[in-house]
């Protein structure tokens, strides 16, 4: 499986649970990137997330031949950019990446659980968690294939 496919499938984890919570009044002036704790905090969440996925027998087959170092770097850049940080994601679009993979809601749901677990492990606040998932949410239609 190509790295771009794996990167895209990992993003699935962020998009199913998209929420609509608003940031608190005091945090509205800071970017989501800053409220998440910057690149270091995003890197820590991604590290935990990829570990969770690797241990998840429901979906870890997607990652069997993946270069995890590259995967993590792509995920960090994607989250960093999506949250208003200075990074740039340069991978393929989610639609291109997932074409023909047959991703269904079951795999998507498993990744959501793994991502939420990683966010919770790092004590990401509910507002920030919901906002991040909401920013990434529109990608779902490009990832999950219709039956």
Question: Where in this protein do the model-derived segments appear?
Answer:
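Bacterial N-terminal signal peptides
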Residues: 8-18
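Core of compact, soluble alpha-helical bundle domains
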Residues: 23-147
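Positively charged n-region of N-terminal signal peptides that target proteins for export
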Residues: 1-5
């Amino acid at each position: 499986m190509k790295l771009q496919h794996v990167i895209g499938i990992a993003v699935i984890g962020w998009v199913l649970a998209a929420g609509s919570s608003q940031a608190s009044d005091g945090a509205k002036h800071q970017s989501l990137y800053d409220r998440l704790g910057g690149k270091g905090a995003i890197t820590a969440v991604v590290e935990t997330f990829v570990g969770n996925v690797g241990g998840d027998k429901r979906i870890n087959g997607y990652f069997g031949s993946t270069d995890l170092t590259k995967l993590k770097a792509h995920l960090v850049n994607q989250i960093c950019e999506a949250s208003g940080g200075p990074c740039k994601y340069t991978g393929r679009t989610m639609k291109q990446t997932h074409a023909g993979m047959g991703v269904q809601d079951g795999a998507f749901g498993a990744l959501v659980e793994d991502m939420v677990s990683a966010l919770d492990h790092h004590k990401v606040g509910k507002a920030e968690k919901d906002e991040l998932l909401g920013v990434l949410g529109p990608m779902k239609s490009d990832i999950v294939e219709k039956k």
